[in-house]
């Protein structure tokens, strides 16, 4: 605790943040930043001071994703429940996203909104979250190393030691090509938190290891429905409850919905957990109706058509073995706007 006390002393002259006066004085924050820099006080101080100024300028507690308000489903990433340890579980589906033409700015904004609100659901002793990435429906437009790098950079620099586990499923060699480009910038500890699984049996066992029956069953059904073609209206509009109460609810598992959606009080929204922006819009009846452009529709229907030979029938049905294509990586020709900046190529690895 000596280094924690030293870091706290070094931060004593920093003006407090509005609405979160104890952000950089509490033990949990100090320990997270020290762990992220392998207990080097100088490096932890630099990182924490940078984060304080970042929060001072961006005001993340009040951040909202206007992209989702302007185009419902712009991001599908949303909290859907908790794991057995009480960690918030985030689920994202490429098939459900209304566009795959994302930028670093809109992706970072949405991720920040989610993380800040997920923090409000964490119990005492919980500091990390779980992210499930369902790659069904992933198109070539979404294969953007620069986007992935930009998001991981912000998360690593300003939310260190927050990511507990990433489960990536239904991916194909195209995704692995993007992952290969990104992971060289990540700390080995971060890479170790990433689990890539294709086999339905394997990700079921993984879910059963970390989640209770309720969330496991919800995830398995959500994943199954998001592999359907065409995608049903209920799954496309994942922010709305199903027409029939007995049907699967794409907003999340029932315990999460009961506690954080059905009981949501807009008058206290600045102090409490806010679910996905479009779920909030659905509650107030303010979600806009936006149709998918013909260009995006063609891209969806063609699902990686340029590399269709890489997507087997087994992959489409979820029955592929993880042993198949484990080392298969597609070398993509990345357009300049999607490439990771050359100036970052020699940057230190992110933790």
Name the predicted role of every residue range.
Residues 1-351:
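Basic, amphipathic alpha-helical/coil surface patches used to engage anionic, phosphate-bearing ligands
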